[in-house]
């Protein structure tokens, strides 16, 4: 049993690409947690997609054993967290399990938007912050300026910040020494009843559900009967252990320790993240506060390209949800695309990752509809409904008003790109809240509609700033807006998969662009096809695909003009009848390309 005073629990937080996972690699290497032949880049990033993109998606935990200069042996529980805003829920779970944080800042880039967002979360959790300036070996590194920037922007003392280069291993011992001397040991009563925080859960095909826990009071050991406080489910503990980063069975976890527990739990849904785990016979008097679950903010439809793959898609989504409880899905059907699922995500990167995992791990070919957000619709009857699928929107005459979610966005940009970014925010209906300057960089705070962000805001932001802008957002509130449903009609029939909810000021432009795009994508038929964009019953844009013409006079070699006229009249009547009863085949490529309209508008 390790003395409680010799345990340190800490998370590594930083902006994307500032070197969190590389620092974790060096700490693991220095503590000899893995043999040299087992070391590789981003050891804790286990998914192929994480290694390929160079990002962390799932927060990972590892226990390191470090012998300090004072001769004592310390157990360091390290949690590597994601940097992207979409995976902020992973960060919040890790921070709730720790007492302190290493704030890693790139010495060449300085404070970025995610640096601030993650730091504020750590401060909310009453963490002791240890500042680490990484990449000091780069020619562009300016540690003194970044120290000043940290003090100016964040307001915390950076005079004793640690100078390191995680890539070449410079200053790693200083980091470990600072962890054991400056960071606090965990609080908690080892003699009290068991009280543990459920940090994460995932599914293992052999062990069932594996749960990651932080023991706050008491201890958890093999054979113990434990109870989940949220649903009073009782389980018998089968295995207890920790990651080093390999799985190690210890049989018991004491106060202040972080590790995994298996107890023949069948479904991840039974293990609510943030739940309190206690002893079934001697339950704790008060449960832990936990943390609020993240609600999905971006929604889209996923449909199999081949209708016969529907059940395979359903099974794949259920399997993915076992390891990622943050995304939701429900069955829906579309007249144009058949049966599929309406899915909710934490952001566009989250959507992209789930889509890529479905295609790669489950070999699925899918159609993704345009992303949308959750709107609040106030009906004339006084009832309020939530709508994220345009097909579910009631008729406009039944609606009193509509509200859309707005976000508070923080943007860091070099001075020379400020004008272009201010123009972009205004174009996206933004409202400026704050503008400050720190060391040649501008910090912008804007209120923006989430509907404008989920399409192409991030791409344009990077394009206008030549890649130098950093961006973070959080939901602010719902605000009333002049929103309408834009319907696309092909030959007078609405195509539900192409309907969108847009602001009235952008409806005409969006409608015209969609009609033009569809005209190029839908193949010509033997009859004329009208493509129309409509708001309610009012047509705002139209394009016409001309009919293919069969030469019915080819077999007439001379003869009376009435013979030719008779054949032409017959063709004309046939086309008229075909226009009334003929179905327009819209290829799937047309849906996919038309839904990308927003990337270029």
From Swiss-Prot:
Membrane topology: Peripheral membrane protein
EC number per UniProt: 3.6.5.n1
Gene3D superfamilies the UniProt entry points to: 3.30.70.240, Elongation factor 4, C-terminal domain (3.30.70.2570), Elongation Factor G (Translational Gtpase), domain 3 (3.30.70.870), P-loop containing nucleotide triphosphate hydrolases (3.40.50.300), Translation factors (2.40.30.10)
InterPro entries the record matches: EF-4, EFG_III/V, EFG_V-like, EFTu-like_2, G_TR_CS, LepA_C_sf, LepA_CTD, LepA_IV
Binding annotation for GTP: 17-22, 134-137
Domain of life, per lineage: Bacteria
Example of a GO cellular component annotation carried by this entry: plasma membrane
GO MF entries: GTP binding; GTPase activity; guanosine tetraphosphate binding; ribosome binding; translation elongation factor activity
Primary localisation category: membrane
Residue stretches making up the tr-type G domain: 5-187
This protein's record includes keyword Membrane: yes
Record keywords: Cell inner membrane, Cell membrane, GTP-binding, Hydrolase, Membrane, Nucleotide-binding, Protein biosynthesis
Reaction catalyzed: GTP + H2O = GDP + phosphate + H(+)
One example of a Gene Ontology biological process annotation: positive regulation of translation
Subcellular location: Cell inner membrane
PANTHER family named in the record: TRANSLATION FACTOR GUF1 HOMOLOG, CHLOROPLASTIC, TRANSLATION FACTOR GUF1-RELATED
Similarity field: Belongs to the TRAFAC class translation factor GTPase superfamily. Classic translation factor GTPase family. LepA subfamily.
Function of the protein: Required for accurate and efficient protein synthesis under certain stress conditions. May act as a fidelity factor of the translation reaction, by catalyzing a one-codon backward translocation of tRNAs on improperly translocated ribosomes. Back-translocation proceeds from a post-translocation (POST) complex to a pre-translocation (PRE) complex, thus giving elongation factor G a second chance to translocate the tRNAs correctly. Binds to ribosomes in a GTP-dependent manner.
Protein known as: Elongation factor 4
Native source species: Orientia tsutsugamushi (strain Boryong) (Rickettsia tsutsugamushi)
């Amino acid at each position: 049993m390790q003395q409680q005073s010799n345990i340190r629990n800490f998370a590594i937080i930083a902006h994307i690409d500032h070197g969190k996972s590389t620092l974790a690699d060096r700490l693991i290497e220095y503590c000899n947690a893995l043999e040299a032949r087992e070391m590789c880049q981003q050891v804790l990033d286990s998914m192929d997609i994480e290694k390929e993109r160079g990002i962390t998606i799932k927060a990972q935990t590892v226990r390191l054993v470090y012998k300090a200069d004072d001769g004592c042996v310390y157990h360091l529980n390290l949690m590597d967290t994601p940097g992207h805003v979409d995976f902020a829920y992973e960060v919040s779970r890790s921070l709730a399990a720790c007492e302190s944080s290493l704030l890693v800042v790139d010495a060449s880039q300085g404070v970025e938007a995610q640096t601030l967002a993650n730091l504020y979360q750590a401060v909310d959790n009453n963490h002791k912050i240890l500042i680490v300036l990484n990449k000091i070996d780069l020619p562009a590194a300016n540690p003194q300026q970044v120290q000043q920037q940290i003090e100016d922007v964040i307001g915390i003392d950076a005079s004793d910040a640690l100078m390191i280069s995680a890539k070449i291993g410079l200053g790693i011992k200083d980091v470990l020494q600072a962890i054991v001397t400056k960071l606090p040991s965990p609080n908690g009563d080892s003699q009290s009843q068991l009280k543990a925080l459920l940090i994460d859960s995932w599914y293992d095909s052999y062990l069932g559900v594996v749960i990651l826990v932080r023991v706050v009071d008491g201890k958890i050991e093999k054979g113990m009967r434990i109870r989940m406080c949220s649903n009073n489910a009782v389980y018998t503990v089968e295995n207890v252990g920790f990651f080093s980063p390999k799985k190690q069975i210890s049989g018991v976890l004491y106060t202040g320790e972080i590790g995994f527990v298996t107890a023949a739990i069948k479904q991840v849904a039974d293990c609510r993240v943030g739940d309190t785990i206690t002893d079934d016979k001697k339950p704790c008097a008060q449960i832990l506060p936990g943390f609020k679950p993240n609600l999905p903010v971006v929604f889209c439809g996923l449909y199999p390209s081949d209708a016969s793959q529907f059940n395979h898609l359903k099974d794949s989504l259920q399997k993915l949800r076992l390891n990622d409880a943050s995304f939701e899905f429900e069955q829906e059907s579309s007249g144009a695309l058949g049966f599929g699922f309406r899915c909710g995500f934490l952001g566009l990167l989250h959507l992209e990752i789930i889509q890529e995992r479905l295609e790669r791990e489950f070999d699925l070919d899918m159609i993704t509809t345009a992303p949308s957000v959750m709107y609040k619709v106030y009906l004339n009857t006084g009832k309020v409904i939530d709508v994220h699928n345009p097909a579910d929107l009631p008729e406009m005459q039944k609606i009193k008003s509509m509200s859309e979610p707005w976000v508070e966005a923080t943007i860091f940009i070099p001075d020379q790109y400020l004008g272009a970014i201010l123009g972009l925010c205004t174009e996206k209906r933004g409202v400026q809240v704050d503008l400050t300057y720190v060391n040649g960089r501008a910090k912008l705070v804007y209120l923006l509609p989430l509907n404008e962000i989920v399409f192409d805001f991030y791409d344009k932001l990077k394009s206008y700033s030549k890649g130098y802008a950093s961006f973070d957002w959080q939901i602010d509130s719902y605000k009333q807006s002049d929103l309408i449903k834009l319907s696309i009609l092909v030959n007078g029939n609405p195509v539900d998969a192409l309907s969108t909810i847009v602001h009235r000021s952008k409806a005409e432009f969006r409608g015209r662009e969609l009609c033009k795009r569809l005209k190029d994508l839908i193949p010509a038929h033997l009859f004329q096809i009208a493509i129309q964009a409509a708001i309610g019953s009012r047509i705002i844009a139209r394009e016409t695909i001309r009919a293919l013409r069969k030469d019915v006079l080819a077999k007439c070699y001379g003869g009376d003009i009435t013979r030719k006229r008779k054949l032409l009249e017959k063709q004309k009547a046939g086309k008229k009848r075909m226009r009334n009863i003929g179905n327009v085949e819209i290829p799937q490529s047309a849906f996919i390309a038309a839904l990308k309209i927003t990337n270029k508008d």
